[in-house]
Amino acid sequence: MPCPRPFWLRHSRAPQGSGPSSPGSLSAPRSPSRGEDQEEEEEEEGDGSPGSGPILPPASPVECLICVSSFDGVFKLPKRLDCGHVFCLECLARLSLATAGGGNAVACPVCRAPTRLAPRRGLPALPTQSGLLPRDARAPPSRQGSVRFDRRRGLLYLRPPPPPPGPRKARAPPPPPPLRLGRPLSRRLSLASPAWVFNAAVALAVLVAAGLVVSGVYIFFLIPHATSSGPPRPQLVALAPAPGFSWFPPRPPPGSPWAPAWTPRPTGPDLDTALPGTAEDALEPEAGPEDPAEAERTLDRRSDGTWGTEAGPGWAPWPRGARRLWGSQ
């Protein structure tokens, strides 16, 4: 069904040949081909599109210009905007949900003029044209209740009036169910909008504050509690050296002869006194050689006293199978 055009946008066209012709038209006759072209152009301008159907009659003043529905006293209340156009409350609510923003204003769908809304009351606070309502819907607002619009949930609902004082004579009819209109148009954050900078700053501040709180709880509460309630741990004690202790040998007094820090190995007869128990540890020869040939080889060595002298002081030949002995021979 094509949408009807408002009556103020339509311009009537006088039928040809119905009225008296001007004198100029009698003196200048038109050619038949030119007259047909002008008639086709006028038809296209009047209809808005070539080949369209017949012009619909103007909308009734008791119908909404958007949904072409009759006004009533519930959700089809006639609401007047600041520009003077009248629409039903349901259509204005759907228009508000389809418009990005906080719902603080609504634009007229005909002239695009904005209308400011009350901060907390919204669309139901617009003036109502009671003269466009049918007679059965012209009840006082105190009896029929108030219509509310929840833009966040997209609901139109009727709030029932308070019960009248006095005895209850008859039950009031139940209110109509709420009308769901859909969700409002969500704002998509993009890099071009300045809102994302504020949101990012708030998120960063929240993260930093949460990190500081967690760190403070861990440092000032968890660590002291763990150290106080846990088993005693061994502590390291620094052992200081005794007073007067020195890591270096004492220096000799001046004028004393120099003595080396090491002592030479004792040689000669002092060895037995310097190393006690050496004679006990020395192994005696097990037994003499039983083979006479082997004994001769052993005796071939120099048996005079100069052999040990040439070899060095304190050196003596040692028999086979015995340990070396230090001392004078």
Curated annotation (Swiss-Prot):
Determine the domain of life of the protein's source. Answer: Eukaryota
* One BP term from GO: protein ubiquitination
Q: Where is the composition biased (Basic and acidic residues)?
A: 294-304
Per its UniProt record, what SUPFAM superfamilies does this chain match? Answer: RING/U-box (SSF57850)
Pfam families in UniProt: zf-RING_UBOX
Q: Which SMART domains match?
A: RING (SM00184)
Q: Where is the composition biased (Low complexity)?
A: 14-32
Cellular component aspect of the GO annotation = membrane
Q: Which positions, given as ranges, span the membrane? A: 203-223
Stretches of Pro residues bias are at: 159-179
Database matches in InterPro entries:
RING_finger_E3_ubiq-ligases (IPR051435), Znf-RING_euk (IPR027370), Znf_RING (IPR001841), Znf_RING/FYVE/PHD (IPR013083), Znf_RING_CS (IPR017907)
Q: How is the protein disposed in the membrane? A: Single-pass membrane protein
Positions annotated as zinc finger (RING-type)? 64-112
Q: Where is the composition biased (Acidic residues)?
A: 37-47, 281-293
Enumerate the GO terms in the molecular function aspect.
ubiquitin protein ligase activity; zinc ion binding
Q: Where is this region: Disordered?
A: 1-55, 122-181, 248-329
**What does the UniProt entry say about where the protein is found?**
Membrane
Could you list this entry's UniProt keywords, alphabetically sorted: Membrane, Metal-binding, Transmembrane, Transmembrane helix, Zinc, Zinc-finger
What's the protein name?
Answer: RING finger protein 225
Q: Give the taxonomic lineage as stored in the record.
A: Eukaryota, Metazoa, Chordata, Craniata, Vertebrata
